[in-house]
């Protein structure tokens, strides 16, 4: 079996836009006509540049080769351009292509990928969702001034609704804006709002749901500890990425100073970056994103390292349903799995992109028994929703926010 063709799509994500403004998908085809799908959690370049990078990577290291040779593909791509170091853009390409290879491998074997990675540990996977506005766009620049992101009453109402639907864990991120400049001290207004938001949600859901407190590296260690003290009384399940991800030694200072478990990993890639998190004691919950972390096999290795240190894994997902499907395949095999990020109930445009919806029941994702990744991308929907813009998937404020 050899890979003979690669094709990419940059697909626009219509309102409400859960998962980002667009998704980047790839299809690999073998000489026997078997196809596999993958997806990148976008890199540091525009989406069409990234799509071309995926094609270039495939043409260099996969076309004409056997998709079973995952380790060889990873090593060649990891060493591309004389680098041999974690490169988030290259690993986004590798991750997309590697999961497409696994999709092919599973289809050829007639088995779900989880059956080829040690077998199924979990019949159902506990899931959580962010709190999203009920109507209109979810992007912060488009929402009304008063919304679930900044109003305790609306957040509590939304959380209670999700619990009624079956979720037993919800996430919010009210801790203030992100800046390209380094971590800062939170403003008192941000600490106060965060505490009021978490308090309102706790009062609304009681003990029926865990609360996941999301941040994205906004703070210094001391600033993060000030925030942690304010929300500790409401017993969040985790405090996510309290400081920038480049210095796990600093994150470890936060971990030692709070009773809230620290979670991190969506901006990390490969076993080498995650090893530093584990070795320094920076987090007890890892959040690899399979569209960036190096692929399914690489993330299985990350999870094994974590297991040896009694660290749990909670796969991250803020993109399209192919990364979601890959997360499900891996999570089903992990003894140290904690919880899975869902984009609500995998409905809306995520459902339209697939020929068969990801199954969600009573707060859990149910792993598919179909071969490969267990889902099939609807290529006609991809073709009907091209994205022509140049925006980055996510971005930070380019200027200092608190001069």
Give, region by region, the residue ranges found by the protein language model.
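Shared catalytic-loop signature of beta/alpha-barrel
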Residues: 29, 56, 72, 86, ...
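Extended hydrophobic packing segments that form well-structured cores
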Residues: 373-403
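Metal- or metallocofactor-binding catalytic centers and their adjacent structured scaffolds
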Residues: 29-109
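Conserved, mostly hydrophobic/aromatic
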Residues: 3, 33, 58, 97, ...
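Ligand-binding pocket scaffold of soluble enzyme catalytic domains
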Residues: 30-32, 37, 108, 126-127, ...
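Metal-dependent enolase-superfamily TIM-barrel catalytic cores that perform enediolate-based chemistry
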Residues: 124, 129-253, 257
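Structured beta-strand/loop patches that form or line metal/cofactor-binding pockets in enzymes
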Residues: 1-37, 41-44, 345-351, 400-403
């Amino acid at each position: 079996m050899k890979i003979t063709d690669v094709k990419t799509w940059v697909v626009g994500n219509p309102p409400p836009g859960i998962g980002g403004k667009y998704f980047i998908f790839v299809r690999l085809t073998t000489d026997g006509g078997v196809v596999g799908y993958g997806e990148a959690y976008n890199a540091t370049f525009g989406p069409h540049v990234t799509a071309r990078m995926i094609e270039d990577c495939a043409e260099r290291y996969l076309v004409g080769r056997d998709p079973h040779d995952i380790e060889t593909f990873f090593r060649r791509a990891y060493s591309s351009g004389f680098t041999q170091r974690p490169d988030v853009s290259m690993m986004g390409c590798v991750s997309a292509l590697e999961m497409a290879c696994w999709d092919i491998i599973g289809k050829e074997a007639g088995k779900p990928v989880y059956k080829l990675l040690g077998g199924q540990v979990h019949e159902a996977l506990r899931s959580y969702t962010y709190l999203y506005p009920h109507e209109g766009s979810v992007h912060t620049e488009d929402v009304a001034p008063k919304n679930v992101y900044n109003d305790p009453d609306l957040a509590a109402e939304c959380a209670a609704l999700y619990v009624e639907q079956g979720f037993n864990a919800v996430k919010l991120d009210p801790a203030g804006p992100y800046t390209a400049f380094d971590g800062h001290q939170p403003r008192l207004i941000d600490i106060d709002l965060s505490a009021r938001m978490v308090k309102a949600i706790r009062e609304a859901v009681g003990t029926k749901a865990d609360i996941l407190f999301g941040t994205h590296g906004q703070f210094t260690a001391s600033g993060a500890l000030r925030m942690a003290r304010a929300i500790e009384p409401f017993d969040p399940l985790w405090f996510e990425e309290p400081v920038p991800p480049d210095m796990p030694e600093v994150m470890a200072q936060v971990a030692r100073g709070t009773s809230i478990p620290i979670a991190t990993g969506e901006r990390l890639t490969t076993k080498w970056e995650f090893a530093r998190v584990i070795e320094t004691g920076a987090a007890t919950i890892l959040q690899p994103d399979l569209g960036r972390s190096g692929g399914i096999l690489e993330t299985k290795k990350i999870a094994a390292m974590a297991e040896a240190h009694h660290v749990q894994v909670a796969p991250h997902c803020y993109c399209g349903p192919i990364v979601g499907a890959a997360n499900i395949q891996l999570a089903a095999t992990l003894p140290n799995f904690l919880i899975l990020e869902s984009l609500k109930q995998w409905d809306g445009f995520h459902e339209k992109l697939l020929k068969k919806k990801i199954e969600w029941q009573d707060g859990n994702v149910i792993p598919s028994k179909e071969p490969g990744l267990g889902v099939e991308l609807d290529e006609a929907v991809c073709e009907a929703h091209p994205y022509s813009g140049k925006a980055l998937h996510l971005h930070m404020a380019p200027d200092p926010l608190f001069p």
